[in-house]
């Protein structure tokens, strides 16, 4: 089964045209060739996991990441998130530290962010696959065009949303978003390289204030312990 067959129904209506584009055919062939050569993450059935977890009509917040974790068993298709039982990565640890300082939420024993996705937080990486052990190895192969279409699809809905763009890479996507209609929360990336500027930026308060103003229930950022 090809990765495209996994595209969730709620997104198929707005992204179906992308699947017919020549670039997407080339991208699919590239990923299949990569899988034939060695491990590619996430597994085929989780490439579109972020879209499956947060249906198109339920997106309140879109958080943009860069590319998947490249270690075996780490990622599961949602940006910043790792499977239960996997050590919380540095950027996510910093996100948790900011949440604790800003909201008082306890730091959880896991990095599994599915509770956010189920509340309408689309955790989207710009690139949806990666070769084992090689960060950014599937950059520039076509995923960026596809995920730009995802961003545009959310931006083109009648309902406003909140877009979270941490770091220079994510902020390059600003031209895809009408800032008159939507709220964009910008700031430093939570990576250890830029965390000093990330800490104290209070993004979660900004997000929830905007979500409430847009007429939706604010996000409960608490991640339950799994231990």
Swiss-Prot record:
GO BP of this protein: base-excision repair, AP site formation via deaminated base removal
Protein name per UniProt: Uracil-DNA glycosylase 2
Catalytic activity: Hydrolyzes single-stranded DNA or mismatched double-stranded DNA and polynucleotides, releasing free uracil
Catalytic residues (UniProt): 67
Record key words, sorted: Cytoplasm, DNA damage, DNA repair, Hydrolase
Protein origin, superkingdom: Bacteria
GO MF annotations, alphabetized: uracil DNA N-glycosylase activity
PANTHER family, per the entry: URACIL-DNA GLYCOSYLASE
Gene field: ung2
One Pfam family of this chain: UDG
The EC number(s) this enzyme carries: 3.2.2.27
SMART domains, alphabetized: UDG (SM00986), UreE_C (SM00987)
Name of the top EC class for this enzyme: hydrolase
Recorded GO CC terms: cytoplasm
């Amino acid at each position: 089964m090809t990765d495209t067959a996994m595209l969730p129904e709620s997104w198929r209506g707005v992204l179906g045209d992308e699947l017919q584009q020549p670039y997407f055919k080339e991208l699919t062939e590239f990923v299949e060739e990569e899988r034939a050569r060695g491990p590619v993450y996430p597994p085929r059935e989780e490439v579109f996991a972020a879209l499956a977890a947060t249906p198109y009509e339920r997106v309140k917040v879109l958080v943009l990441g860069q590319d998947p974790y490249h270690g075996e068993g780490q990622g599961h298709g949602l940006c910043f998130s790792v499977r239960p039982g996997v050590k919380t990565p540095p950027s996510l640890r910093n996100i948790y530290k900011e949440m604790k300082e800003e909201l008082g939420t306890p730091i959880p024993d896991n990095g599994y962010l599915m509770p956010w996705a189920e509340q309408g937080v689309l955790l989207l990486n710009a690139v949806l696959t990666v070769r084992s052990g090689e960060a950014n190895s599937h950059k520039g192969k076509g995923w960026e065009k596809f995920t730009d279409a995802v961003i545009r699809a959310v931006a083109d809905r009648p309902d406003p949303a909140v877009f979270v763009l941490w770091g220079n890479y994510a902020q390059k996507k600003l031209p895809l978003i009408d800032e008159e209609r939507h709220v964009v929360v910008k700031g430093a990336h939570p990576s250890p390289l830029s965390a000093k500027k990330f800490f104290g930026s209070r993004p979660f308060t900004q997000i929830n204030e905007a979500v409430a103003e847009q007429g939706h229930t604010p996000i409960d950022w608490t991640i339950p312990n799994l231990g």
